[in-house]
């Protein structure tokens, strides 16, 4: 039994699962990390990492950075554009295939065992242990960590369906000449009229643009909205070498269940993504750090709810207020752009969300308490037409 017994089995080697495996292995635990895919694998995602996201990692990721981002073009249907620069505080653009593989390599280097092409099939509890059946055989562990995405099979197996609400997102990879990439001047673009009750984005990478749309309000016409967004930009609309990809972004955990004793949900599997920007990697990594702290506190008490307690202390409030910020802004989308995005004070609050200067709760109350000021103010960030 000792040779096949792991302290922790992690299903899913995306950022949350792999980073938790890395942290848990550093604590001295015997960790098994499994993923159904063969690595490196393509992963549909905008690939923008905010500064606060990068700051959660305790190792360097320079080798997988496609482009450093210093700011953003902010526009409404490709009109009335303004620029917000944050310098080195903004973030980076990565390809998920390389970024995820880097974290897996770090986890393996810290002592975690990694099994790829190893799919979860079923699991059952036997006392304080969990027996997990995978396509690679039977595994026994003291803890089972579900980090297998928004459509988590582990979560469904133990908690049933309907736990996580999600919204569709779609993106396109558009290969453009270097001159167009250079014209972005290491900025991303957010178009707050590019998607009804949502936004469109353009992220420059090394050799292509990642272009997509997102809304917290689910829509069946999202592919049409992406094509409409691309049509707003003549330099993109005439391109023919476009690859389309769809995926889902979790919005919330409907049932508020993140743990059942020694079964824990991380990242997308737990419904962790903020609602305004649709950013999931930050909260995925944050949940991994919280889980590692909880494991350090309560490893010998498998029925302890330490993980849930720490989530409530450190993260769930921020997620709740991200939903309030999104509904406040996107319910009045055009007004939101012209009175909030273009207003220097309000813009600063939402920009600080990206770098970690404020949380969503503070941003919400600062914005709401100053509503009469920015609603009647004529102040605006300076206009700046992009060169693409």
Where are these predicted regions, by residue range?
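Beta1/beta-strand and adjacent pyrophosphate-binding region of the FAD-binding site
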Residues: 2-14
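Conserved hydrophobic helix-helix packing surfaces used for dimerization/oligomerization
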Residues: 8-10, 31, 263
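N-terminal Rossmann-fold NAD(P) dinucleotide-binding loop
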Residues: 17-18
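Glycine-rich FAD pyrophosphate-binding loop
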Residues: 23-44
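A conserved beta-strand/loop capping segment in the N-terminal third of enzymes
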Residues: 50-102
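Predominantly flavin-linked oxidoreductase catalytic cores and closely associated redox partners
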Residues: 106-237
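FAD/FMN-dependent oxidoreductases across multiple families
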Residues: 120-122, 138, 217-295, 299
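C-terminal helical "tail/cap" subdomain of flavin- and related membrane-associated enzymes
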Residues: 293-388
């Amino acid at each position: 039994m000792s040779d096949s017994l792991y302290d922790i089995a992690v299903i899913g080697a995306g950022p949350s699962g792999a980073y938790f495996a890395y942290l848990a292995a550093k604590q001295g635990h015997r960790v098994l990390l499994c993923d159904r895919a063969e690595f490196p694998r393509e992963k549909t995602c905008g690939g923008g990492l905010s500064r606060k996201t990068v700051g959660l990692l305790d190792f360097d990721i320079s080798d997988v950075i496609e482009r450093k981002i210093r700011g953003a073009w902010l526009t409404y249907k490709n009109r009335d554009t303004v620029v917000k620069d944050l310098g080195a505080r903004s973030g980076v653009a990565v390809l998920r295939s390389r970024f995820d593989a880097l974290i897996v390599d770090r986890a393996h280097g810290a002592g975690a065992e990694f099994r790829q092409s190893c799919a979860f099939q079923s699991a059952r509890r036997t006392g304080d242990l969990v027996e997990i059946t995978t396509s690679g055989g039977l595994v026994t562990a003291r803890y089972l960590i579900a980090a297998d995405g928004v459509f988590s099979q582990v979560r469904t197996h133990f908690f049933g369906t309907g736990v996580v609400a999600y919204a569709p997102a779609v993106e396109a990879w558009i290969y453009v000449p270097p001159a167009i990439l250079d014209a972005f001047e290491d900025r991303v673009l957010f178009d707050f009229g590019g998607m009804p009750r949502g936004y469109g984005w353009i992220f420059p990478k090394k050799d292509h643009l990642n272009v997509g749309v997102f809304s917290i309000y689910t829509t069946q016409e999202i592919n049409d909205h992406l094509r409409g967004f691309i049509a707003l930009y003549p330099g993109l609309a005439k391109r023919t070498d476009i690859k389309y990809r769809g995926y889902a972004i979790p919005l919330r955990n409907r049932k508020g269940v993140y743990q059942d004793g020694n079964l824990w949900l991380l990242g997308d599997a737990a419904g962790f993504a903020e609602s305004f920007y649709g950013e999931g990697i930050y909260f995925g990594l944050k949940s991994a750090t919280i889980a590692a702290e909880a494991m350090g506190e309560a490893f010998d008490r498998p029925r302890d709810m330490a993980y849930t307690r720490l989530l409530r202390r450190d993260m769930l409030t921020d997620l709740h207020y991200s939903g309030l910020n999104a509904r406040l802004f996107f319910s009045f989308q055009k007004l939101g752009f012209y009175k909030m995005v273009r207003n220097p004070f309000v813009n600063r609050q939402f920009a600080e969300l990206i770098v970690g200067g404020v949380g969503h709760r503070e941003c919400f109350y600062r914005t709401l308490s100053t509503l009469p000021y920015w609603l009647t103010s004529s102040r605006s960030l300076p206009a700046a037409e992009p060169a693409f």
